[in-house]
Curated annotation (Swiss-Prot):
The chain crosses the membrane at residues 28-48, 57-77, 102-122, 142-162, 199-219, 240-260, 276-296. PROSITE patterns: G_PROTEIN_RECEP_F1_1, G_PROTEIN_RECEP_F1_2. Glycans are attached at residue 5. The lineage of its organism: Eukaryota, Metazoa, Chordata, Craniata, Vertebrata. Belongs to the G-protein coupled receptor 1 family. One of its GO terms (cellular component) is plasma membrane. The gene is OR51L1. This is Olfactory receptor 51L1. CDD domains: 7tmA_OR51-like. Coiled coil: none annotated. InterPro entries: GPCR_Rhodpsn, GPCR_Rhodpsn_7TM, Olfact_rcpt, OR51/52/56-like. Pfam families: 7tm_4 (PF13853). It is found in: Cell membrane.
Amino acid sequence: MGDWNNSDAVEPIFILRGFPGLEYVHSWLSILFCLAYLVAFMGNVTILSVIWIESSLHQPMYYFISILAVNDLGMSLSTLPTMLAVLWLDAPEIQASACYAQLFFIHTFTFLESSVLLAMAFDRFVAICHPLHYPTILTNSVIGKIGLACLLRSLGVVLPTPLLLRHYHYCHGNALSHAFCLHQDVLRLSCTDARTNSIYGLCVVIATLGVDSIFILLSYVLILNTVLDIASREEQLKALNTCVSHICVVLIFFVPVIGVSMVHRFGKHLSPIVHILMADIYLLLPPVLNPIVYSVRTKQIRLGILHKFVLRRRF
């Protein structure tokens, strides 16, 4: 591809390639992704509606699950428009301003997911290690402040990224590797010195995903230590069972993130399609699987869904 310099352009335009080399199956892939988005949308909306309707679920743990569901909706909807435009409508062009906005939302929701998972780990820590103080520590006001802090942190760390990208010139082509805009994907097209942006991005990842994962791990070390001090084995299993759903969603989020990082750092020899699929998985897997995990593993939510969609229709 020839050089593409936007120095004189009013606004540069990027080309979203979707799945390079698999253009002949884009229509079939669009069906699969539409189904995945539909599952994510219906699952998270169901979780939100059940928690909203059932007064017995108006508790700290379920409020955090609601925040996670809202974030998962945002994460899936941030990639949906361009994904379907590329795969379904064969419309790969995207203006730079729209691209910057999309990557801002994608990365904000990603970091917000990590923040919410950390808050949920804190919820489990307080519930198991300090059960008598649980209602007084995690009040509605405190939960609201935690949610706001998570949002502000995510917005704050991501906001400089598109602001820096707006001042860059791009002379290494205009084709992006994915069906949506990602920070590193846009950055590699720049002919401006991008070390500041690149270093900032690395620092943000370490300070958010890295620190969050360490504190989540630490919380479970403390939880396990408390559980082992419980005399009754039945009570031990009961306490641990309340953490299973959260552990599952933590793995669903962090395992693909680690996989993407490993492939990006050490998988230069791999086919580009592997990198693309890994990015798609890490963005789409949590919104699709999280509501399924909570529907299957959390008894109160499962009963709420049955009451809302099955029992009410019978009567």
